[in-house]
Amino acid sequence: MNNPMEEQQSALLGRIISNVEKLNESITRLNHSLQLINMSNMNVELASQMWANYARNVKFHLEETHTLKDPI
């Protein structure tokens, strides 16, 4: 005769393994999606850095030429 507790534990262990495999697949897909998002955000970050550098250069130029005016 088989031990009913052993059968129950085996069934539970099988369910746990199945759920962990599904979780692993979901996390793998999430990581891939995050990589794609990060790659697409690189262009936005670059444009932001360029704009900040441009604004800093314009401010420096206006201060040096004494044409910087107070905000309205």
From Swiss-Prot:
Coiled coil where? 15-35
Compartment(s) = Nucleus; Cytoplasm, Cytoskeleton, Spindle; Chromosome, Centromere, Kinetochore; Cytoplasm, Cytoskeleton
Gene Ontology terms describing biological process? attachment of spindle microtubules to kinetochore; cell division; mitotic sister chromatid biorientation; protein transport along microtubule to mitotic spindle pole body; spindle attachment to meiosis I kinetochore
Top-level lineage group: Eukaryota
Keyword set, alphabetical order: Cell cycle, Cell division, Centromere, Chromosome, Chromosome partition, Coiled coil, Cytoplasm, Cytoskeleton, Kinetochore, Microtubule, Mitosis, Nucleus
Full protein name:
DASH complex subunit dad4
This chain's function reads: Component of the DASH complex that connects microtubules with kinetochores and couples microtubule depolymerisation to chromosome movement; it is involved in retrieving kinetochores to the spindle poles before their re-orientation on the spindle in early mitosis and allows microtubule depolymerization to pull chromosomes apart and resist detachment during anaphase.
Please give the chief subcellular localization of this protein.
nucleus
What is one term from the GO cellular component aspect held by the record? DASH complex
Per the record's keyword annotation, is DNA-binding included, yes or no?
no
The record's comment on protein family reads: Belongs to the DASH complex DAD4 family.
Query: What is the source species?
Result: Schizosaccharomyces pombe (strain 972 / ATCC 24843)
Q: What is the lineage of its organism?
A: Eukaryota, Fungi, Dikarya, Ascomycota, Taphrinomycotina
InterPro entries linked to this entry: DASH_Dad4 (IPR013959)
Quaternary structure annotation from Swiss-Prot or TrEMBL:
Component of the DASH complex consisting of ask1, dad1, dad2, dad3, dad4, dam1, duo1, dad5, spc19 and spc34, with a stoichiometry of one copy of each subunit per complex. Multiple DASH complexes oligomerize to form a ring that encircles spindle microtubules and organizes the rod-like NDC80 complexes of the outer kinetochore. DASH complex oligomerization strengthens microtubule attachments. On cytoplasmic microtubules, DASH complexes appear to form patches instead of rings.
